[in-house]
Design a protein with these regions (language model features):
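Right-hand nucleic-acid polymerase module
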Residues: 1-108, 118-275
Length: 275
């Protein structure tokens, strides 16, 4: 990625085995759903890190208070909004880039959280008001202590927001997050390592330093072909030295408070049969 390297080590239960996915037979286990949420958060974070900067925008799109919104209307509204927004960007010779998720409040009110590249916020607000009659608030993207976009927390928040609709029978989208097709993915390299190369305290490489706050040694969920079970995992981030040397004091914005994204309290009993 632009400013760092994200390392993810895990044990592969399929190594050296011919294991194929069996057809779905029953509801997806909770552990597997959690794993899929975590994987979606990682992919979403990679796209944010590679395509957005601190000057880009975090939008919150809402509907008028106490106005119930059906999923079909929400889908049509957001599609129409993106079509108008794409046209507005094109007039300024800018290519629209976006990532968004749909959520619901405890009272069932639909809202969207969206990342877009830098643009006139007055135009964006007027377009959404014209389509939905609702409001729009915005901030610049949240930064971390090193002064670059805090893509991990933003991605976690987006996936947490999508859980409010994705696990309902009347879900708005069939995806955990929606993104424009022009987003670039970082280069992903896979390699086999020996057990002795798995250090509890990982070492850095030339030109990078290990972010001590990012080190995680624990367990993740592994599909061994028969059932989902725990496996040993390690995650950490390598920060480019140039970022650390050039960082300045920046005003830090914090995300709204929310429960731990993958805690036991965040799971809804109302799930569709096709999950």
């Amino acid at each position: 990625m632009k400013n760092n390297i994200e390392v993810y080590k895990y044990y592969s239960g399929k190594l050296g085995k011919k294991i194929y996915n069996a057809p779905a037979q029953r509801k997806t286990p909770i552990n597997q759903l959690k794993y899929q949420d975590q994987k979606a958060s990682r992919i979403c974070g990679w796209k944010i890190a590679e395509n957005f900067t601190k000057d880009d925008l975090w939008l919150t799109l809402t509907y008028p208070a106490r106005q119930p919104i059906e999923p079909e209307k929400a889908r049509k509204d957001i599609s129409l909004f993106l079509a108008y927004l794409r046209r507005a960007y094109k007039k300024e010779n800018i290519e629209l880039k976006y990532i968004y998720t749909a959520g619901r409040t405890k009272r069932g009110m639909v809202h969207f959280h969206m990342l877009v590249n830098k643009f006139d916020t007055t135009i964006i607000a007027n377009l959404w008001r014209k389509i939905s009659g609702g409001g729009m608030s915005f901030k610049h993207l949240f930064l971390n202590e090193y002064g670059y976009v805090n893509y991990k927390k933003i991605a976690d928040y987006l996936i947490k927001n999508s859980q409010e609709t994705f696990y309902r029978k009347d879900r708005i989208h069939k995806k955990r997050f929606c993104a424009s097709l022009n987003l670039v993915m970082p280069e992903i390299r896979k390699q086999l390592i020996k057990a002795k190369g798995w250090k509890l305290n990982p070492s850095s490489i030339k030109g990078y330093l290990v972010d001590k706050n990012s080190i995680y040694n624990g367990y993740g969920w592994l599909d061994n072909g028969e059932h989902w079970d725990c496996c040993r995992v390690q995650r950490y981030t390598l920060i480019h030295i140039g970022v650390i040397c050039n960082r300045r004091r920046t005003k830090k914005h914090s995300l709204p408070s929310m429960p731990e994204i993958f805690s036991e309290d965040n799971w809804w009993e109302e799930r569709g049969d096709d999950i």
